[in-house]
Amino acid sequence: MKVLVLGAGVAGVSSAWYLAEAGHEVTVIDRAEGVAMETSFANAGQLSYGYTTPWAAPGIPTKALKWLFKSHPPLLFRPDGSLYQIEWLWQMLQHCTAARYQINKERMVRMSEYSREMFRRFEAQTGMNFEGRKKGTLQIFRQTKEVEAAKQDIAVLERYGVPYRRLKPEECAEFEPALARVTAKIAGGLHLPADATGDCRLFTENLYKLCQEKGVRFHFNQTISRIDHNGLRIKTVETETGRFEADAVVCALGCFSRTVLAQVDLNLPIYPVKGYSLTLPVTNSDGAPVSTVLDESYKVAITRFNNRIRVGGMAELSGYAIKLPEKRRETLALVVNDLFPEGGDLNQTLFWSGLRPMTPDSTPLIGRTRFDNLFLNTGHGTLGWTMSLGSAKLTADIVSGKDTEIRSDDLSLSRYQA
């Protein structure tokens, strides 16, 4: 079967890999000049299988209001002039109940745990190097009230069988030795040993090469201009320079899935939530992080690659425009310099921003649509890297008409159309 994948980020390229593995003739198109040029370019680098949590949770509306008034807020809201922004926020608020949280949490954990297994199989199969580490995530709390608040999160971890260890301030240095220098700034910690790290862009670039070896064709600089359909079947996808036909189409366009599929009257509840990152060279390995450190106060993650440190975080709801405000850079620099002052060189940084495709319930959109041959693999929010291989394998199985290894019916767009 001929399959056309829209999007060459980690979701699209991973989908192409599993579709090719299943024996399909696969073509991938993207508007960028290469793979992983947008949301997958410089994300935080966490493979946070264990700490998969919906944004929409009880108490979040109150917390969000408090965050907005911080000098270095983890959440920023700027009206983008659209009614849709308000509609999306209202939808998200409907999921901030204990009942909805449990439903969404179960879906996310199921997807993340499946992705963990897919990464295990993939690495065993390919031996790919993407600067990955399997040394867990260390969440640190700067205030006693944060330690107390974490008890609710720990109860969720226990409910879903996620391994963890609560830490006293001095115990945090067992996992991140460089933090011994700043123990006085830490009130406690939580270690998730099953989490991992890796460079999403490097992974996607390497997977692109493996896909080519399997015969997958890539067409870059292809901006989609039109999608033609006959009844409930997609016929062609047209770009400014080409026309593509396929038996099946997989949409993995991240935030732009919504705008592109609006052409065929599909209403995808995806909003672009902006995140920021800094990448800096390691100057002193002993003073740098070993894996990922998540600063609960600032909602910033600090991740170690081989010779680089990636600092990522924040959530900004302000539309599709990509800007790089110096204030956001200052927040990221403040956190990494406060915890790892001797680890990296802040005079040599790459400052980046990307758009996360977020759904109101924080769960991705995977599977069938009302069109017989149009499938989704999008809407992963902050967990696109974590869920990448699991989502892609699930998508490939659905496209192929195979039984999936995990439940997938409640991940489709239909949950928003009931």
Curated annotation (Swiss-Prot):
Cofactor: FAD
GO cellular component: cytoplasm; plasma membrane
UniProt keyword annotation of Amino-acid biosynthesis present: no
Catalytic reaction annotation: a D-alpha-amino acid + A + H2O = a 2-oxocarboxylate + AH2 + NH4(+)
SUPFAM superfamilies documented for this protein: FAD-linked reductases, C-terminal domain (SSF54373), FAD/NAD(P)-binding domain (SSF51905)
GO biological process, one term: D-alanine catabolic process
Disulfide bonds: none
NCBIfam families named in the record: PRK00711.1 (NF001933)
Family to which the UniProt record says this protein belongs: Belongs to the DadA oxidoreductase family.
Job of this protein: Oxidative deamination of D-amino acids.
The protein's name: D-amino acid dehydrogenase
Name of the coding gene: dadA
